[in-house]
UniProtKB/Swiss-Prot annotation:
The keyword Transferase applies. The keyword Transferase applies. This is Bifunctional purine biosynthesis protein PurH. Residues 6-151 form the MGS-like domain. The IMP cyclohydrolase activity resides in the N-terminal region. The gene is purH. It comes from the Bacteria. Its EC number is 2.1.2.3, 3.5.4.10. Belongs to the PurH family. It comes from Pseudomonas aeruginosa (strain ATCC 15692 / DSM 22644 / CIP 104116 / JCM 14847 / LMG 12228 / 1C / PRS 101 / PAO1). GO terms for biological process: 'de novo' IMP biosynthetic process. It catalyses: (6R)-10-formyltetrahydrofolate + 5-amino-1-(5-phospho-beta-D-ribosyl)imidazole-4-carboxamide = 5-formamido-1-(5-phospho-D-ribosyl)imidazole-4-carboxamide + (6S)-5,6,7,8-tetrahydrofolate; IMP + H2O = 5-formamido-1-(5-phospho-D-ribosyl)imidazole-4-carboxamide.
Amino acid sequence: MTDQTTRLPIRRALISVSDKTGVVDFARELVALGVEILSTGGTYKLLRDNGISAVEVADYTGFPEMMDGRVKTLHPKVHGGILGRRDLDGAVMEQHGIKPIDLVAVNLYPFEATVARPDCDLPTAIENIDIGGPTMVRSAAKNHKDVAIVVNAGDYAAVIESLKAGGLTYAQRFDLALKAFEHTSAYDGMIANYLGTIDQTRDTLGTADRGAFPRTFNSQFVKAQEMRYGENPHQSAAFYVEAKKGEASVSTAIQLQGKELSFNNVADTDAALECVKSFLKPACVIVKHANPCGVAVVPEDEGGIRKAYDLAYATDSESAFGGIIAFNRELDGETAKAIVERQFVEVIIAPKISAAAREVVAAKANVRLLECGEWPAERAPGWDFKRVNGGLLVQSRDIGMIKAEDLKIVTRRAPTEQEIHDLIFAWKVAKFVKSNAIVYARNRQTVGVGAGQMSRVNSARIAAIKAEHAGLEVKGAVMASDAFFPFRDGIDNAAKAGITAVIQPGGSMRDNEVIAAADEADIAMVFTGMRHFRH
């Protein structure tokens, strides 16, 4: 059994990196500790230019770099020095003049950055597939019993600190080896994803010939947290985040206080945050069981997020109990005080949490307080996944959104300016409500939300019931539907409730009947031409 605590000293290191961040200081520290440096190409030149003693790999192997750098380190004196088992292969290594290499610091050609360039064609991509680098990484990781592999510049400082303490323990080398295999796995996945989108039937294999979906789908996620249980107590669960960080999200958020996030906390917080991101003006979204139960937008000069919270809460105070609250502005102390004094809340998330808000919420130790950072106004494209038994559904993220100029007025009466503001507000909310989704809204406040019904008419009925229960007036409100109305009954019921304007995608075989129903009731109706099913 391997001794977990015995420290491995480093006498010889091979350094060959594409990302040269911190490598000069790292190599200088190694030399100061008496480590001999082997290096290649640009890394060797950089070290020598900075006065660091190093031996070029070609001089060590007696074999020059060739084929425009395609062959540099693929040599027995390199891989024998890395793979050689110190307790078994010493005689063979000595016989062939192979020196042991105790540490390998390698990172790979920037394939992802290369293929992301709009002018990248297939030959350019191929030349940026690293061969020698992954081979050294895998060799060192395989022989982690005797060799340390470093693929991340962020580990340089810790490695040096350990060497100053006498060497690297087996546990450290094992962890570095795992990082190395994760690194090469992600790298090969990127290559497979790229090549898998190439249309092989074309003569010119450039970026224009790429499809959207690769033949095999590779994506890497890193475990961020093991959870007490999953969606239900009898299910085990963990939270994995994308290896490559994107825009501000629940995955990138920092938890400032509170109990550990549960499986359902993460899912609901994601729903709340993604909804509130839809609004440019100060907004509050309250979510329960992944559905918005209250949303409001209030300009800064009319009360901002403090007023928005009051209005969102007023939509459905019962459902807000134990809910998730998201803001798109910094959480201030006054708003935080209003929340914790009024209701039980599981999670509060905002781009920034003020010191005053932190102090207020600290009195409620179990409340989970998350700070996620700012996000760009222009939403980044990406992928959504849905697991099915034996498969994975992959689609582009639903970042589609409409503006006033995109609306098609289909009724005799055009909506007023205020109705247009409310229609777009309600449409943004409906996008995040489980289908079939109906949202009633007025003055950029949700009045009633009907979610998840098999019948669209029943969703509308529930929205009306919610409004009545909250003491909110439906008369004079607008209505949003995430998909078209298949029959006129949805509009007839809306007219009876006092709805004045409707926003929906359109596209039903009976659109003319639906439009006629709206005209009969003097309801203004607009089509978006875009559906927002959410299952």
